[in-house]
């Protein structure tokens, strides 16, 4: 499946990735803004965690392509890395960084475990 992205152009996803993208857990990311409240100041800053996650897969593939030219990477490992990129924001909540950074209601998501 190919998904057309405004930043990266066409991004290709395999059947397993599409089945993950189609889950309610990933689809909920469509409703979470990547930049939280920034769109109140910058009205066009409205991209979502969903769009960001798709773009992360694109960037990850570019890295994998570069590494593959130097190293013999296991196809299964590349598949796991792409899926990890797709799911890296799966636990985000709306305004999550605001709760982490400004209100100190939650530990930072990138500093140790949240669970």
Where do the protein language model's features map onto the residues?
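Alpha-helical phosphate/pyrophosphate-handling elements in metalloenzyme active cores
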Residues: 41-79
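Short amphipathic alpha-helical segments enriched in hydrophobics
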Residues: 24, 64-67, 94
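Active-site flanking loop/helix segments enriched in acidic
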Residues: 20, 28-51, 100
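Non-catalytic interface/linker regions that flank or bridge core catalytic/transmembrane domains
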Residues: 1-31
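Generic detection of long, well-ordered alpha-helical segments
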Residues: 10, 50-54, 113
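Divalent metal-dependent catalytic cores for phosphoryl transfer on phosphate-bearing substrates
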Residues: 77-115
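Short, mixed-charge, low-aromatic patches
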Residues: 9-20, 36-39, 73-77
